């Protein structure tokens, strides 16, 4: 494989010295970009974009052609695993993801297969290898998956949910059944991420989007325990260099110390944490990624720069910080404002790395 021309993202995750703070954005390939909307129209729909390696590669690279980002992230969806388990993923306009089959009994869980990444999710592996080849060493490629808890909520609720009542009821009424589901998902995520690493992903992130909706005790039992299991089973070195792992629990700021003990290299932070406080709590153990409120991108350019400067100052001097948003960039953001954000990170962070 081609040598990396820009490895500051990987270096920051491993707390090695960098010249400026690296930056990328969750959902950087997305609807805020006119070129993405054109590709999606050409593909027909969202799943056709995901399942065609050429389209997935095209949209992954679009933000890199527009901005000086320090990483690319595979264009895919967290729900590819439940889809490969036979649940029948589809997207309802205005409602988001739905499943044709819903998990409601222990028998449903017993019947679920653990997908083979090559056979059942080969289109994702092909997308990873295609993107990696096309990147040609420009920046590292991030692979990703949803966390077992987050995937389980969609599988049990049948789609998005405001209160996760069915999944939480299962946690209290029939914890053995939920643990069986989470265990199958942990096995699936481990092999899926390892497949992505072997196909060319140079770092991986686990998105625990709904872990922050649990009580402290339930978070430990039903979310963090399974992420810990995944981390312990991941390939951590490939192609002669370390493969960093990032854990991101949205609304997980109360539990940073526990998450930092899970064995990952970095923690993703949402915007409700103060990054300087997070560094004081866990920064000797792990790198930190985040954490500007994505809605700041609706503000004027000078306000965006001011908030970037504030977050950089909060983190302070030295490496171990990857700048990102605290969640995904939203569709109505002006692409020019995203550019202001990315350029501000590079320009204003140099003083912290002298």
Swiss-Prot record:
Its EC number is 4.1.1.37. It is found in: Cytoplasm. Pfam families: URO-D. Belongs to the uroporphyrinogen decarboxylase family. Homodimer. Substrate binds at residues 27-31, 77, 154, 209, 327. The record marks 77 as: Transition state stabilizer. One of its GO terms (molecular function) is uroporphyrinogen decarboxylase activity. Keywords: Cytoplasm, Decarboxylase, Lyase, Porphyrin biosynthesis. The keyword Cytoplasm applies. One of its GO terms (cellular component) is cytosol. This is Uroporphyrinogen decarboxylase. Catalyzes the decarboxylation of four acetate groups of uroporphyrinogen-III to yield coproporphyrinogen-III. One of its GO terms (biological process) is protoporphyrinogen IX biosynthetic process from glutamate. The keyword Lyase applies. Pathway: Porphyrin-containing compound metabolism; protoporphyrin-IX biosynthesis; coproporphyrinogen-III from 5-aminolevulinate: step 4/4. HAMAP family: URO_D. InterPro entries: UROD/MetE-like_sf, Uroporphyrinogen_deCO2ase_HemE, Uroporphyrinogen_deCOase. It catalyses: uroporphyrinogen III + 4 H(+) = coproporphyrinogen III + 4 CO2. SUPFAM superfamilies: UROD/MetE-like.
């Amino acid at each position: 494989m081609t040598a990396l021309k820009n490895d500051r993202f990987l270096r920051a995750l491993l707390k090695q010295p960098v010249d400026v703070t690296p930056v990328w954005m969750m959902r950087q390939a997305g609807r805020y970009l006119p070129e993405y909307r054109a590709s999606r129209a050409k593909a027909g729909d969202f799943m056709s974009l995901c399942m065609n390696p050429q389209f997935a590669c095209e949209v992954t690279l679009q933000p890199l052609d527009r901005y000086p980002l320090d990483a690319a992230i595979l264009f895919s969806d967290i729900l590819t695993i439940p889809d490969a388990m036979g649940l029948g993923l589809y997207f309802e306009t205005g409602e988001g993801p739905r499943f044709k089959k819903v998990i409601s009994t222990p028998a449903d869980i017993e019947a679920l297969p653990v997908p083979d990444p090559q056979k059942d999710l080969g289109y994702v592996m092909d997308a990873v290898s295609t993107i990696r080849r096309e990147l040609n060493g420009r920046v590292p490629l991030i692979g990703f998956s949803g966390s077992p808890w987050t995937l389980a909520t969609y599988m049990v609720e049948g789609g998005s949910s405001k209160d996760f009542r069915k999944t939480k009821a299962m946690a209290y009424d029939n914890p053995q059944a939920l643990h069986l589901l989470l265990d199958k998902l942990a096995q699936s995520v481990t092999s899926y991420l390892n497949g992505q690493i072997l196909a060319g992903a140079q770092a991986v992130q686990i998105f625990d989007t709904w872990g922050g909706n649990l009580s402290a005790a339930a978070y430990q039992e039903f979310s963090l325990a399974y992420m810990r299991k995944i981390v312990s089973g991941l390939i951590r070195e490939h192609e002669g260099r370390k493969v960093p792992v990032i854990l991101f629990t949205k609304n997980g700021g109360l539990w940073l110390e526990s998450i930092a003990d899970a064995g990952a290299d970095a923690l993703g932070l949402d915007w409700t944490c103060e990054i300087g406080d997070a560094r004081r709590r866990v920064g000797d153990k792990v790198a930190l990624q985040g954490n500007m409120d994505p809605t700041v991108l609706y503000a004027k350019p000078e306000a965006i720069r001011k908030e970037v400067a504030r977050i950089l100052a909060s983190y302070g001097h030295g490496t171990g910080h990857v700048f990102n948003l605290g969640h995904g960039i939203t569709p109505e953001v002006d692409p020019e404002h995203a550019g202001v954000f990315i350029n501000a990170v590079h320009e204003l962070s140099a003083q912290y790395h002298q």
